[in-house]
Amino acid sequence: GYQFDKIFPGCRIIDIHEYLLEKGITLQGKGAFLYHDPCHTPMKLQDPMKTVKALLGDGVVKSERCCGEAGTLAVNRPDISTQIRFRKEEEIRKGEAELRGQGLIGPKDNVKVLTSCPACLQGLSRYGEDTANGLLEADYIVIEMARQILGENWMPEYVARANNGGIERVLV
C-alpha cells in the first residue's frame, strides 16, 4: 500500500477533482456534458457524480456502463470489449438525447463526454462518430476546466501559471 503517511506524517491524499472543488474552482453552468464514471473512480470523498456536478454545474448527465477499454481488455478480449462497446454506445445516445431534449446542447452541436481515467479516455475516443447528430468529443474533466478557465490557448498559459506557483501547479 501507500507509504505516504510514513514518509510525510500527517499528509493527505486527495483526488484533483475534490481538491479543485475544495478550493472553489468550478465552471458552474458553463456547458453541458456527459460524464463517464470510471470503474475505478479516483473520487473517494463523496459520490463522484456529486463532485462532478459541483465542479461543472447541473448540465451534466451520467453516462452509465463500462466504456469497454478496461485496461487491456480491448486488446486481450476484443470479442468481449466489442459487446461492451455496443452497450456503451446505446448509453451515449441516450445521454445525448437527454442533453438535447433538455435544450442543454443544440440539435447539431457536438457532445462532450468527460472522464477522469486515461484508459476510459482512450476507450471513449473510439466513439467519436457514434452520436445521432454531431460528434462525440472525449476529454478529461480537468482539461475541460483548464480550457474554459484559461481559454483555448490554455496550455502555454497553464504552463506559465504553473511555473509562477499558481493552483495549476498541482496538476503538473
Where are these regions (language model features)?
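Iron-sulfur cluster-binding electron-transfer modules in prokaryotic oxidoreductases
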Residues: 1-172
